[in-house]
Amino acid sequence: MGKVSEIYNTLLFLHEGNRRIWPLEAEDEFSEGKYDDSYISHRRKGQESLKKLKAFPEIKQRMANMARYMNEDFHETQVRLSHQLGNLTSKQVTTNVIENLESNPNSILYLIDKILDQAQAEGVSSGTLHIVSPYLFSGRYYDEEGELIYDGAQETLQFLSQNPDVKLEVITNSVMTSDNFFTQAIIDMDMAPRFLLTPEMQEIWLSSREKGEFNPDVIESEEWQRLINHPQVFIYQTGGTDSVILGGDAHYGKLHAKFIFGNSGGFVGTSNFDYRSNLYNNELGFFFFGEGVRQELIDVFEDLKSTSYRWGTPEWLEMRRKVMESDSKKAGPARKQRGTFKTIRALGLEYLM
């Protein structure tokens, strides 16, 4: 598997469209001005930052144990490498999304789709699909005539309605933990509402904070409670009202993990499952089949869930309100989410996020 990964990265980095980042052959070459590569200064800054990071006591201790760590606690697991190399040559990445997927049968999204089809064909009608991603979207694509050709949320909800014993659990960032205000606006104003709210309630939620999020007639209504407590869809966002940015003592770092697992296997890789990962980036990851790795991911998932709120619940709404009222740098972007999302959509920038 290591050899296969090496070949993948070699093909990627040697692609003619990439800029070369040559290493220094000797320490004094930079000062002599031999290299005119503008990336060198960034590489130096990166090395200095890495040096500082490794000097932290906890990191230093873990680095000292790295040799042992790399040789212990491995699991016997079936593994398959998957990639998005097809994105290197795709020209019409949004309008030809289906054709592009079918032309790259080893792509991450193609294989996920086939695995789900196979599970359905084999009569698997119960279980839970777990997804962790910092910037999770659910793709919606149109052809050149503007006709909808695929809606990820719609497809998933249809599958769930046909399989009432299947659940979907998602963990992603919140306005408190996200480092990308634009993608978080898409998550809170589009992705989660498409899974949980009716079109009418989506319109109210998106209209304004006063008419939706801060309106007791909406968030305390029986309809709202019924919608957000979907028996099969659970969307959690990391963070809590005890955070240091709200005057508490808890530290919530940004979520950056990306993995999926189901009843017997899953996927771990670089893809965020947002538009940028799906359409433009050259993502890499491994599908696995084995209980050992799966159990470790279960433990990570449950740990993350214990420090998260379910989307739409009173606790989640309270966290958002307190973030908006705080004096942190998160406050402004949280208050402006609706305007941010509407601007992104009006300018057609969703697919670049």
Feature names for model-found ranges:
Residues 98-120, 148-154:
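A Trp-anchored, charged/polar loop motif used as the substrate-binding/catalytic surface
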